[in-house]
Amino acid sequence: MDTIVDFKALPYRKCVGILVFNYEGKVWVGRRLMTVSHANVDMSKLWQLPQGGINQGEKPIDAARRELYEETGIQSVKLIKEAQDWFEYDFPQELMGHVLNNKYRGQTQKWFSFQFTGEISEITINPPPDGNKAEFDQWKWVDLEELPSIVVSFKKHVYTQVVKEFRNSFKYL
């Protein structure tokens, strides 16, 4: 017998999201590797910023640096800003059962922005460093304002908030 899950009763997973600005003020984005859950998604909407879960007892800033390295190989960064608030999104119904073992209804994210101070050769996504699982198959630098138009629809409102929050970050570098 199938168990019916009330997804609205599930908690949000605590995560971090990371913006990395280059010296021109552009932001690093990666294109998600295709999975079964992406089967009906427009390929032009598979771009996203690095993000990931916060481990038990881990500080959000430490999770941000760890996730950035695990997903991109980037370590040469300088912190610019931490978002004041947490931003959250719900997983769409069609992804339920495909993400995080149905333990969460969505994610609540603390966002950070960093200045990239390294060399392009530091960026390694497929495979990423230390045997981590690849999450991206391509990457590029884009204008911050472009972000909401290149992500999946259920994250668009969060990316709009992120753009507003970090819009002036590059001016203070």
Curated annotation (Swiss-Prot):
GO terms for biological process: nucleoside phosphate metabolic process; ribose phosphate metabolic process. SUPFAM superfamilies: Nudix. It is an enzyme of class 3 (hydrolase). This is RNA pyrophosphohydrolase. The lineage of its organism: Bacteria, Pseudomonadati, Pseudomonadota, Alphaproteobacteria, Hyphomicrobiales. A motif (Nudix box) lies at residues 52-73. Accelerates the degradation of transcripts by removing pyrophosphate from the 5'-end of triphosphorylated RNA, leading to a more labile monophosphorylated state that can stimulate subsequent ribonuclease cleavage. NCBIfam families: PRK00714.1-5. GO terms for molecular function: bis(5'-adenosyl)-pentaphosphatase activity; guanosine-3',5'-bis(diphosphate) 3'-diphosphatase activity. It holds the Pfam family NUDIX. Its EC number is 3.6.1.-. Residues 11-164 form the Nudix hydrolase domain. Belongs to the Nudix hydrolase family. RppH subfamily. Its cofactor is a divalent metal cation. Keywords: Hydrolase. Transmembrane segments: none annotated.
